[in-house]
């Protein structure tokens, strides 16, 4: 597939999927289902560019392999090909279906594309509470209103949402922990008898490598294209290589 598509100029997300042949069909099936069509602001361009399929891969990475967190699209797919299994993809598939059934099309202002892997991780923690999925939708609705500016350890949904990065591990950790804390408080989920709900940002070497990437994105946004994304940066890097 990679050889046949050399002249088509596949983007980063599309090329990355060629590194995960075992689960590629499953990933495509999930990305083509109702959550991406109904529960977020659907974009045909994003679908054609493989961005929804990449969101599925990042969700599996976040939910099941966060200790080995990878940032790049190719690195994620390469890792999952060797370390994931069909049960993990089936579980994430179920989570997408349950969120869609609970939220329908009423939470699009919160369930934005850049945060899909974060919300799948938060939902995986919600599932452990045993509450009905409608309660998760109640929380998302509340986050659209009063909770969006509520402070948690110096940050809020609004402040995190303004950050330009989407895959920086420090930012992903902050979002998961902040949104989970807001959810637990709003739904009165008792976590005292369970292990900590917080994920940790313990990969120092990777974190140090992430900062230059964030600077690159910020530089491009400030000096060339204010709408540039991290996927654009990855695509340009691939072209140079």
Question: What are the language-model segments listed below?
Answer:
Residues 112-164, 178-181:
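C-terminal hydrophobic structural anchor segments
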């Amino acid at each position: 597939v990679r050889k046949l598509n050399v002249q088509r100029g596949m983007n980063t997300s599309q090329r990355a999927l060629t590194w995960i042949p075992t689960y590629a069909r499953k990933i495509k099936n999930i990305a083509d289902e109702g959550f991406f069509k109904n529960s977020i602001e659907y974009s045909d361009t994003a679908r054609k560019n493989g961005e929804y399929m990449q969101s599925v891969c990042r969700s599996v990475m976040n939910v099941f392999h966060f200790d080995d967190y990878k940032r790049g699209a190719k690195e994620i797919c390469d890792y999952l090909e060797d370390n994931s299994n069909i049960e993990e993809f089936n579980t994430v598939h179920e989570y997408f279906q349950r969120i869609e059934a609970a939220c329908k099309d009423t939470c699009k202002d919160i369930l934005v594309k850049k945060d899909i892997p974060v919300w799948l991780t938060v939902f995986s923690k919600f599932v452990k509470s045993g509450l009905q999925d409608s309660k998760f939708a109640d929380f998302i609705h509340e986050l659209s209103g009063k909770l969006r500016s509520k402070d948690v350890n110096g940050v809020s949904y609004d402040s995190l949402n303004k950050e330009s990065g989407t895959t920086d591990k420090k930012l992903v950790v902050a979002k998961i922990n902040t949104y989970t804390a807001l959810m637990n408080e709003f739904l009165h989920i008792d976590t005292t008898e369970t292990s900590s709900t917080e994920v940790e940002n313990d990969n120092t070497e990777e974190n140090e490598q992430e900062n230059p990437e964030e600077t690159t994105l910020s530089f491009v946004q400030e000096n060339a294209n204010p709408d540039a994304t991290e996927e654009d940066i990855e695509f340009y890097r691939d072209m140079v290589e």
